């Protein structure tokens, strides 16, 4: 199998879930990053299926849409649960996390509500539901003690919210413990520490970095 190529921007954004999955599982990949406003991206965009990123190219196939990429990698690398029931639960959890992300996006890019609203109401109200859903399976991860593709989006989004407010996870001990465990994973820790030190932007604008 050829080394997969991941195309995304120089920010964390939606591409970061995919990077984390590759890194944590020791899967070699090319991490190709475009400047959001650069000419290189504008030219590359013209030849793409839907004209958007992230894009994963593997064995001649171009896969776009974040969810499609993550589920593909989940199936290929044994990160999609052990049966249809678990796979469906992961699907549900993944989409639930993305719904929370879109609430955050509306604050970041469209100034919907204040930072205080986002930190004290919008995100916490959603995390209450995710905390309960996480508890449906006992163990360190979403479906027990085996990591899945959905754990990477959950971790990244929790980290994004923690950057926004360092205390935001304190009322959600199960999710906070999960977030702390993920930070300590051997294949992720050095990358995460460097990302933090380099202050890699989460979004296409600086908003959300403090």
Curated annotation (Swiss-Prot):
Disruption outcome: Increase in susceptibility to 4-hydroxy-2-nonenal, paraquat and heat shock and a reduced lifespan.
Group of enzyme by EC: transferase
Catalytic reaction equation(s): RX + glutathione = an S-substituted glutathione + a halide anion + H(+)
Alphabetically ordered keywords of this record: Transferase
Any GO CC annotation of this UniProt entry: cytosol
Residues the entry annotates as binding glutathione: 8, 41, 45, 52-53, 65-66
Tissue-level expression: Expressed in cells at the mouth and adjacent to the pharyngeal bulbs of the head and also in the tail.
Binding partners and assembly: Homodimer.
Similarity-based family: Belongs to the GST superfamily. Pi family.
Protein name according to UniProt: Glutathione S-transferase P 10
